[in-house]
Amino acid sequence: MDKIHLYDKILSPMVTEKTTNLSEQNKIVFKVPRAANKTNLKKNIEKIFKVNVTKINIINKQNRTKVARGKKVNVQGYKKAIITLKKGQSIDLTSGI
């Protein structure tokens, strides 16, 4: 499989206070396309980063409406994946993908 197709399944890493705390438990959080599923994500992450994935949890964030300057604006939803790595392994997100 071509490297470009592998990277299509991972949009970006999510770096927040909560995800930073999860990284201490060998968990990494990525924003993924809505069409992504657990089996494809596991294969792609293991090929790209050369780590062993033990578990994947997927959270689907729905579209929501927000008011901006008196007008209703739709904010597009997204899907995020929480990936649990084998103990002792990690992914360095600061080096760039």
From Swiss-Prot:
Pfam families, sorted: Ribosomal_L23
Keyword Ribosomal protein: yes
InterPro entries linked to this entry: Nucleotide-bd_a/b_plait_sf, Ribosomal_uL23-like, Ribosomal_uL23/eL15/eS24_sf, Ribosomal_uL23_CS
Gene3D superfamilies: 3.30.70.330
Complex and partners: Part of the 50S ribosomal subunit. Contacts protein L29, and trigger factor when it is bound to the ribosome.
NCBIfam families cross-referenced by the UniProt entry: PRK05738.2-4
Protein name in UniProt: Large ribosomal subunit protein uL23
Organism: Pelagibacter ubique (strain HTCC1062)
Name of the coding gene: rplW
